[in-house]
Amino acid sequence: DKNTQFMKGIGVEVRFVNSGEGYNRHIKLAGDYGMFHELMVGLKSFKPKIPDRCYKNQYEGNFIENDDEDIKAVKAAIGNIPYWDTYKISQLSPLSYEIRKSMAKKGCCSICAGFGKRAQGLVYAGSRAGGISVSMRDFWQKFPSSLWIEGMRNDIGKITAWIWSPESNGCDFRHYDDEGHANGTYEGFNEVKSDPVGIANTNELSIELYESGIVSDDTLLEVSKRVQKPALFVATPEYYHEVKAFGEWSLVRRDTPLRTWLEDELDRAIDFYLKEPDKQNWYGLFNYGDVMHTYDAYRHMWQYDMGGRAWQNTELVPTYWLWYTFMR
């Protein structure tokens, strides 16, 4: 019932095994430009002192072994170093994400570990048991999304990929008015108005498992790149035209002044349209991939609040134009 039920969050939970010492448990999150790498227990101690080479060794992705030359110093200090349990990276807008971490203790707060603009949508947890990464395609584009790693202190941890993050406002499926405006704003039918029944949204998650060792930043960034921009089979315009699977249409021709002018105008129009999603922030779980229908020359913005003139929703002319542009 759209009047009483609101979507606070929807996600997928994956559990994984942790084993070994806390200082050999690693957490990585893909940010704007690289990996945010942390440790459940970072071996940085003021008193008693642990040699810096031990801390450096951790961040180089190496396990600290029991026969390490600094193990006595580690064991002397380990009881006074925080054991971090939970890491969250949350993209609640298309322009900002936040990373927070906590010890998951009752009555204790989480702390901010950093900010960025557009996260890449991958998290990784690794220990002596191996590692796991979870990636969300179009992570920042389909905000509000988040990835949580919890239970790093435990034998069993979990990663939750939130397609709609519970840290955001609940999703309200009600119409903006209690009456229809079919004639005035070209939307739906007055008898039915706007109804959320039948709404669907496809989301892609990728899980990768690693046998041993701590996976390098470069490897994880390559995984993220592959998930965000997977390889696709694309034919040439000539092939699409030849097989006629999409009916009759013309290839690009510039053999007359008129055809040259038409092609130039089409190029200018598509170039403008392709830049609009980023300029206008046409992002969000239910908006990404869609485009606006009609521009308001007086407000100097798209008619976002005028029903059928707002989101295009694969209807009529823009869809045909964009598909034909792709094929040509």
Q: Could you tell me what each predicted segment is?
A:
Residues D218, E222, P257, V317-Y320:
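Extracytoplasmic/secreted proteins, especially bacterial periplasmic and envelope-associated proteins
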Residues R309-F326:
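Well-ordered alpha-helical segments within folded domains of soluble proteins
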Residues D1-Q5, L322-R328:
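Conserved catalytic-core segments centered on acid/base and nucleophilic motifs
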Residues I214-S216, D255-L258, T325-R328:
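Structural helix-adjacent loops and short alpha-helical linkers that scaffold large soluble proteins
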Residues G188, W302-G308:
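Active-site-adjacent structural elements in folded domains
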